[in-house]
Amino acid sequence: MQLRLFRRLLLAALLLVIVWTLFGPSGLGEELLSLSLASLLPAPASPGPPLALPRLLIPNQEACSGPGAPPFLLILVCTAPENLNQRNAIRASWGGLREARGLRVQTLFLLGEPNAQHPVWGSQGSDLASESAAQGDILQAAFQDSYRNLTLKTLSGLNWAEKHCPMARYVLKTDDDVYVNVPELVSELVLRGGRWGQWERSTEPQREAEQEGGQVLHSEEVPLLYLGRVHWRVNPSRTPGGRHRVSEEQWPHTWGPFPPYASGTGYVLSASAVQLILKVASRAPLLPLEDVFVGVSARRGGLAPTQCVKLAGATHYPLDRCCYGKFLLTSHRLDPWKMQEAWKLVGGSDGERTAPFCSWFQGVLGILRCRAIAWLQS
């Protein structure tokens, strides 16, 4: 009897360890699974011809320049011309940070041209120019801004990053309804890319790097990284008129499901990954779903996405000081009011905090607690 009880307790403990490994604070199991993808990828495809991208109406070429070290993290926020309230909420919260953990951060907004037929914001071209002059954080390209043009918008942003912000170590692509925990994201990237001292020692040589033939000489290469909330074995939607529809011509059924890709609500690319994707993107099928397109291009380049459970993907997490301050790197579907409430909750408006974000017990439960809160309130 005692032996049977002991076996049951041992089995329960083993199951608990498995669950903790897969879903605990580190998300180690999911990350190991995503890392194993690299060995299954085909050999990298040969580079394609240069991408034919629309010209920039507001190029903002000097956004990453200036005194001091170059940006460690460049954040590109996909927005729409009419979403001024969302942009202002980001500027007044996490997007207003210029430094995190002692490293420079730069946030820019990506958008296209407003629809001239729209009854409310069809004539906002001059408003955007005024906003850009006042804020200095707008990148606008010459294409009609729409959901189906997100791929064009994202590629324009990545291409700008490679040309005008080549010294940035990492690029985060996100949307204007996403809260970003910038300090914790910077910490996460530093841990993945090496010791703090490695970056601190390399900023001075980079700042004074020589330029030969228009090419900036990097003193230290950043390892390839494509980090996000990974979607696995997603089949294309064929629903007529659907927002996420992908036609048979764009992705034939014989190709099967999409390769693994990171949710477009927030994924990080190292500078080397940005260069890789841009090199092979012209040979990838031009899909309207930008996150899928980036995943397909990454696969063609021999790069697999790495799972990060702290990046929320499409999940909306209710406001919680511990989750938003410590364990989450992003949270989706926040309106402008919620964005600023989240910022106040973590003490962002005060510039400092006097108490820990989490209790000891909350810290032990980690990301698992945040997931449970989201599930209970969904």
From Swiss-Prot:
EC number of this enzyme: 2.4.1.62
Pathway: Protein modification; protein glycosylation
Pfam families: Galactosyl_T (PF01762)
An MF annotation (GO) of this entry: glycosyltransferase activity
Any one biological process term the GO annotation gives: oligosaccharide biosynthetic process
Tissue occurrence: Highly expressed in heart, skeletal muscle and pancreas and, to a lesser extent, in brain, placenta, kidney, liver and lung.
Protein's UniProt name: Beta-1,3-galactosyltransferase 4
